[in-house]
Every structure is written in C-alpha cells, then in structure tokens.
C-alpha cells in the first residue's frame, strides 16, 4: 500500500 507512495516520493525527489 505504501509502495506507491515511496515510489512517488522518490520520483518527486529526482524531479526536483
């Protein structure tokens, strides 16, 4: 359930 949230957080961090 939290896997998607972690992935999104990582993508967001990389996008920054």
Curated annotation (Swiss-Prot):
Residues 1-16 form the C1q domain. GO terms for cellular component: extracellular region; postsynaptic membrane. Keywords: Cell membrane, Disulfide bond, Glycoprotein, Membrane, Postsynaptic cell membrane, Secreted, Sialic acid, Synapse. Coiled coil: none annotated. One of its GO terms (biological process) is synapse organization. It is found in: Secreted; Postsynaptic cell membrane. The proteolytic processing to yield cerebellin seems to occur either prior to the secretion by presynaptic neurons and subsequent oligomerization or in some other location after release of the mature protein. Sialoglycoprotein. InterPro entries: C1q_dom (IPR001073). Localized in the Purkinje cells. Cerebellin and [des-Ser1]-cerebellin are equally abundant. Homohexamer; disulfide-linked homotrimers. The trimers are assembled via the globular C1q domains. The trimers associate via N-terminal cysteine residues to form disulfide-linked hexamers. May form oligomers with CBLN2, CBLN3 and CBLN4 prior to secretion. Once secreted, does not interact with other CBLN family members. Interacts with GRID1. Interacts with NRXN1 and NRXN2 long (alpha) and short (beta) isoforms produced by alternative promoter usage. Competes with NLGN1 for NRXN1-binding. Weakly interacts with NRXN3 short isoform and not at all with NRXN3 long isoform. Required for synapse integrity and synaptic plasticity. During cerebellar synapse formation, essential for the matching and maintenance of pre- and post-synaptic elements at parallel fiber-Purkinje cell synapses, the establishment of the proper pattern of climbing fiber-Purkinje cell innervation, and induction of long-term depression at parallel fiber-Purkinje cell synapses. Plays a role as a synaptic organizer that acts bidirectionally on both pre- and post-synaptic components. The cerebellin peptide exerts neuromodulatory functions. Directly stimulates norepinephrine release via the adenylate cyclase/PKA-dependent signaling pathway; and indirectly enhances adrenocortical secretion in vivo, through a paracrine mechanism involving medullary catecholamine release. This is Cerebellin-1. It comes from Sus scrofa (Pig). The gene is Cbln1.
